Amino acid sequence: MASSSNYDGILLGMGNPLLDISAVVDDEFLTKYDIKLNNAILAEDKHLPMYDEMSSKFNVEYIAGGATQNSIKVAQWMLQIPGATSYMGSIGKDKYGEAMKKDATAAGVNVHYYEDESAPTGTCGVCVVGGERSLIANLSAANCYKVDHLKKPENWALVEKAKFYYIAGFFLTVSPESIQLVSEHAAANNKVFTMNLSAPFICEFFKDVQEKFLPYMDFVFGNETEARTFSRVHGWETEDVEQIAIKISQLPKATGTYKRTTVITQGADPVVVAEDGKVKKYPVIPLPKEKLVDTNGAGDAFVGGFMSQLVKEKSIEECVKAGCYASNVVIQRSGCTYPEKPDFN
């Protein structure tokens, strides 16, 4: 094993830090707020009363979340090397923001938050029915991230130090300027830049900005629903996840340093990995239904596990194995949480 100093700040994430407000709800609640399971959306006005209703009607848990932050925390947990990961995003100056800072720091992540004076820390309603989750994000302060924060010397130093970057697609709606700086830096310095399709609405309504950064993506993550939405939006006329994964991996690249690898998870079905015009499928670890708590954070955990081995320059097979291990741990718990130490080798 290389000395831990080689891993100092090796992985940097940027995204929307959100406090998950998670509860097992009922179908009636989903219908009332027009919520579909296995989806992720931004809150509209009609959703705003939902958060209070959740806490008054159901048994609510508050868990530090946000897609990229989840993945970075899981990577940090898998690596067990202090300071291997860093993260930037925007929180409010309030108790939720403080709680988030405490949580991420306790997880061993080097967080450099932008603290917004006017907006409260963002929240994400996590509605669980039958173990499946739906996410309704009220970004608030997370939406206020400014590229000026990234440009500050102490923050840009994190970009310089990192060799791998992960940004969830959700951040495209917040600070494309920041994504541009980081992706161009990665390309110019032969570093590895990775993103996630993240949600159908990103592929559909933020198609142009997503396409702008696709050439920079060395790894593209997503799930089967997002992949099919991506295919439809691009007029590919195929629902076949393997074909879609190949097509995504063959889209133009900004540099020839790395070939693009596309990694699509499909819940309990095998993980599809496309590179070089070929597809490989990797089975996930089966889990009996009664052990499933909820799928919140499953995709994030997969990416975290995957990245934890990628930074060690392990094979794709090892990376997928670690991703499957991490998501298997997380779906047996509420939210994107994990025990003290991983049991992965």
Curated annotation (Swiss-Prot):
Pathway: Purine metabolism; AMP biosynthesis via salvage pathway; AMP from adenosine: step 1/1
Chief location bin: cytoplasm
PROSITE patterns xref list: PFKB_KINASES_2
GO MF entry, a single one: kinase binding
Catalytic activity: adenosine + ATP = AMP + ADP + H(+)
Keywords assigned by UniProt, alphabetized: ATP-binding, Cytoplasm, Host-virus interaction, Kinase, Magnesium, Nucleotide-binding, Phosphoprotein, Purine salvage, Transferase
Top-level taxon: Eukaryota
Single biological process term from Gene Ontology: adenosine salvage
InterPro entries: Adenokinase, Carboh/pur_kinase_PfkB_CS, PfkB_dom, Ribokinase-like
The enzyme's E.C. designation: 2.7.1.20
Tissue specificity: Widely expressed.
PTM statement from Swiss-Prot or TrEMBL: Phosphorylated by KIN11.
Biological role: ATP dependent phosphorylation of adenosine and other related nucleoside analogs to monophosphate derivatives. Essential to sustain methyl recycling.
Name of the protein: Adenosine kinase 2
Entry's family note: Belongs to the carbohydrate kinase PfkB family.
Origin species: Arabidopsis thaliana (Mouse-ear cress)
